Amino acid sequence: MQTQSEYADTHVTHVKNYYWRIAGFYFFYYAFIGMFAPYWSLYLQSIRFSAVEIGILMSVQPVMRMLAPSLWGWLADHTGQRLRVVQVAATLSAVFYLGVFVTTSFWGMLLVLALMSFFWSASMPLVEATTLSYLGKHTARYGRLRSWGSVGFIGSVVGLGYAFDYIAISWLLWAGLISELGILLFSRQLPETQVAAHHTDQQPIFNILLRPSVMLLFGACFLMSAAHGPYYTFFSIYLVEHGYAKSAVGGLWALGVICEIGVFILMPRLAHRYGFTRILIASFALAVIRFMMIGWCVDFLVLLLIAQVLHAATFGAYHAASVGLIHELFQGKHQSRGQAMFGSLTYGAGGMLGGLISGPVWQYYGANMLYTCSAFMALLGLILVGWNSSGRFSQAAY
């Protein structure tokens, strides 16, 4: 079996052969998020769900991101058929998504979103593992490839934002279907990658997970995801209630992602100069500032624009650095499950917590307190990641 360095040198030269296939998957996957995150709550509001019901329904996807990826990651590592698992999951996700066209009841929508999200959430951790395996030792280049997901997000959020100033929000369902079909198409174009041998292969994966430095990283990232829960659940409703047009809502979402793309492109240089851990610390610090600005400065457009620019740090830099660290920590046969567990315990569990608390806090205490809670959770994450600022994250796998 090839060593890590031999595998990287052999395969990184072929990245361009599959560049657009991987980029296409990222494009449609995040185009779906660009449809879902800003506008699904508005669609639910249009069919007369309450704030608490919207909070619950918007938390279904994070719940599935917590429960499903570890199962799919185990299946991919156990069978050695990572790509096949992605394809099956993409197919079933598209099939179950069709249910949104036939239900407007709370329990019906809950069931459809749960089934769709169970399979939808399976794909990305496995594709992340595939992409990073394919890049080999050149993981800093991940950001440039991942930036095509941001392009898909922008196209979706801006296009739909302008469209919904003229057409009914119910057309959102068709945009989601197009994205699901794109995911399905490109899942069948992805490269199959070999898993390089690593000396941690004989260790149970929980031996790695339970290392103090790894637990601190997971805990901090859990809090960052929880902090973003209110943003993804109520930000669009928040803006509309303060008089912003839907096209302006789309523009503000897009601004953050445009800046995110810039960070992804610059990530190889930033990672080389500062390292992933320092980038994480800066991301958490800026998240505290950003959420306070969103909560208390929504009527000041200039400050709101600055808050959206900070999305480059609170998601773009944060995501690239955290995924890079997870790839260093979980190597060899643990790659798929490592990324899957990271997705489950951070984006899944953290997003679920943030989404679930957002409904009651929004309804009883208002948006100011809701986004102050987000800032507080980011502050707690900053404390955890700062605790490990000596760089032990990246050394934990060795």
Place the predicted regions along the sequence by residue:
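Structural signature of the two symmetry-related core transmembrane helices
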Residues: 84-98, 278-293
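Helix-loop junctions at membrane interfaces in 12-TM secondary transporters
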Residues: 101-113, 295-307
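Helix-to-loop junctions at the C-terminal end of transmembrane segments
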Residues: 67-81, 164-165, 263-276, 362-363
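Juxtamembrane intracellular "pre-TM" segments in multi-pass secondary transporters
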Residues: 5-16, 187-221
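Helix-loop boundary and gating motifs at the non-cytosolic
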Residues: 9-62, 214-221, 225-252
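Interfacial helix-cap and linker-helix signal at transmembrane-aqueous boundaries
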Residues: 44-45, 75-76, 147, 162-167, ...
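Cytoplasmic helix-loop-helix junction between adjacent transmembrane helices
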Residues: 114-148
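Symmetry-related core transmembrane helices of the 12-TM Major Facilitator Superfamily/SLC fold
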Residues: 171-188, 369-388
